[in-house]
A protein has these predicted regions:
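Non-heme di-metal
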Residues: 2-278
Length: 278
């Protein structure tokens, strides 16, 4: 299948979150549950982003399309900066008393010593392409539905920036996969592994943080449950329609029309959108 993605160059942008100022323990509307749902996925980002970079870079020399080659380099730049920015938040969680090192050690061991060492390169790339599809759906929902309006400004800026750039490079890993290993069974295998790993690690991280949060039990659960019900559509689209969409043989990430959404957000904060490539 040929690529239908817009020929845009993902533009790496610098963002240095200011975590010197105190960050509220429950920075998402003062509620523990949504805070730790997002804290949980934040713990997954740095190791995940580096896995994605290596999975695509392995095949870079086999990409004979000069435009896709440049898009991949933009992808590396964006994902590398995402990893650094999200990793800087770990010190905030540690300062708040959360013990995250053991979780991170296990998570990285499974990702790097398990999946990355055992799975063949093509399967790692297929997992990456599927994960990029999931994160692009999350990114679109974050921007379109203003999911983070109740979040602390520093975290909101970090996550909105990340969301916009995820949309910009949403098709890069998929296009590389279609160039070097255009197998539908391989794509499906990558999807199944990605869905299991993302959901499993995310639930584990969120549960670990909630377990350590002594104030969680003292809060009224009603407002938190209502908020999560209101936002349930965002997560259900990832593991429901998102999976069904990816299983279509003619699927391509560009079929989700959300590039302008990312460009509009970036322009609203004074950042230049992705540039067109010839």
């Amino acid at each position: 299948m040929t690529s239908a993605s817009p020929r845009l160059m993902p533009r790496p942008r610098a963002l240095a979150p200011d975590f010197e100022s105190p960050t509220p323990r429950h920075w998402f509307g003062g509620l523990a549950l949504p805070t730790h749902v997002v804290n949980g996925v934040n713990l997954l980002f740095p190791a995940g982003e580096r896995f994605f970079i290596r999975s695509v870079r392995y095949y870079l020399d086999k990409v004979d399309d000069p435009v896709l080659h440049e898009q991949a380099r933009g992808f590396f730049g964006q994902e590398g900066r995402h990893a650094q920015a999200h990793e800087s938040f770990f010190q905030v969680l540690t300062a708040q008393g959360y013990k995250v090192k053991d979780f991170l050690r296990i998570y990285e061991f499974i990702a790097y010593n398990g999946i990355e060492r055992v799975a063949p390169p093509a399967l790692r790339l297929a997992v990456t392409a599927a994960c990029e599809h999931f994160t692009a759906i999350l990114a679109e929902g974050t921007l379109r539905e203003r999911f983070l309006d109740a979040a602390h400004p520093t975290l909101r800026a970090l996550l909105m920036w990340h969301a916009a750039e995820e949309i910009e490079h949403k098709a890069v890993a998929f296009d590389v996969l279609q160039r070097v290993a255009p197998s539908y069974p391989l794509r499906v295998a990558g999807l199944l592994i990605a869905a299991a790993c993302l959901s499993g690690f995310w639930i584990a991280a969120t549960t670990m943080l909630l377990w350590q949060d002594r104030k969680f039990g003292a809060q009224r659960l009603g407002p938190q449950a209502r908020l999560m019900r209101e936002r349930r559509g965002l997560l259900s689209r990832v593991f429901g329609p998102g999976i069904r969409q990816y299983l279509r043989r003619d699927f391509h990430p560009s079929q989700n029309d959300n590039m302008q959404l990312a460009a509009d957000y970036l322009q609203s904060v004074g950042a230049a959108p992705a540039q067109a490539l010839s």
